[in-house]
Amino acid sequence: MNKRELESAIVTDFSKRMSYGDYLCLDQLLDCQHPLSNPQHHDEMLFVVQHQTSELWMKLMLHELQAARILVQQDKLSHCFKILARVKQIQRLLFEQWAVLETLTPSEYVEFRDVLGNSSGFQSHQYRSIEFLLGNKNAAMLAVFSNDADKHAALKAILEAPSLYDEYLLYLSRHGLPIPQECIERDWTQPYQRNPDLLPAFKEIYDHPQKYWEAYEMAEKLVDIEESFHLWRFRHMKTVERIIGFKTGTGGSSGVSFLKKALELTFFPELLDVRTEIGA
C-alpha cells in the first residue's frame, strides 16, 4: 500500500504547544504577499516572492557579515571561516534565484510593471548595508532613506564604521605585517581605494601560507565573496536586460547601463592584484 502510517509518538495536539508555524510566524510571513495589479496578474506573485525571499537571504547574509567583522576586531580570524563559507553559499542561492525570475517574459512583466511605481531594488536597505559592510561606501546613498529615520541611522552607522576589509587590514597591522598607514588611518565613510603599497604584505602572506595560515585563509574567503558578488551583479544585469531590455529602471536609473557600471566595482582589489606577483 502506497501509504506511510503516522507514528503514535508524533505530536498532533498543539493547543498548548508551540507548532512549526508558531515558531516561524508563518501566518504573518505568508500574509506579506500582496500583488497590486487589478485584476491580479498571475506572474506578479512570482515577482513579489522573488524579491521577498532575496531580502530574507540578505538578512542572514548581513547577520553573518556583521558577526564576522566583530570576530576580526577580536583577532578571532579562524572563527570567521565557517561564517564566510556560509555567506558564500547564501550568495550562490541568490545567484541561482535569478533563474526563477528569468521565467518571467517581457510581455508578461509589462502587464503589471506600472504598479511598482518608483519602487526599485536600488532602495533595498539590506543590500546597501551589505555593500557598505564590504567597503563599497557612498554617503549619497543615505538620501534614499531620508524618510525613514531608523534605516537612515542604521546605514549611517555602517557607513562610519570600518568595513570588513578595513578590519582585516587592521588585524594584519596588529600582527606585524607592513600595512600602509593610509590604509588603516583614513575616513571610513569613503570607499576603499586600491593601494599598490599594500601588495608586499599580501605577497608575504601568499609566499608563506603556513606561517600566516589564518591571514591566508581569510584572504581566500574574502576572494570567494568578491567573486560571488561579481557573478551576482552580472546575473542581475543580464536578467534585467532579458526582461526589460534597455528601458529606464522603475527607480529612475538608466537600467542596464547603470547596472553595468557596478561590474567595475571591487571590494578587495589588492587580493586580486597580488596574484600577478606570486611566484614572480
Swiss-Prot record:
Keywords: Dioxygenase, Heme, Iron, Metal-binding, Oxidoreductase, Tryptophan catabolism
Matching InterPro entries: Trp/Indoleamine_2_3_dOase-like (IPR037217), Trp_2-3-dOase_bac (IPR017485), Trp_2_3_dOase (IPR004981)
Annotated binding of heme, by residue: H236
Cofactor: heme
Domain of life assignment: Bacteria
Gene3D superfamilies membership: 1.20.58.480
Catalytic activity, as annotated: L-tryptophan + O2 = N-formyl-L-kynurenine
TM region positions: none
EC number(s) on file: 1.13.11.11
Subunit text: Homotetramer.
Family label: Belongs to the tryptophan 2,3-dioxygenase family.
Function: Heme-dependent dioxygenase that catalyzes the oxidative cleavage of the L-tryptophan (L-Trp) pyrrole ring and converts L-tryptophan to N-formyl-L-kynurenine. Catalyzes the oxidative cleavage of the indole moiety.
Protein name: Tryptophan 2,3-dioxygenase
Gene for this chain: kynA
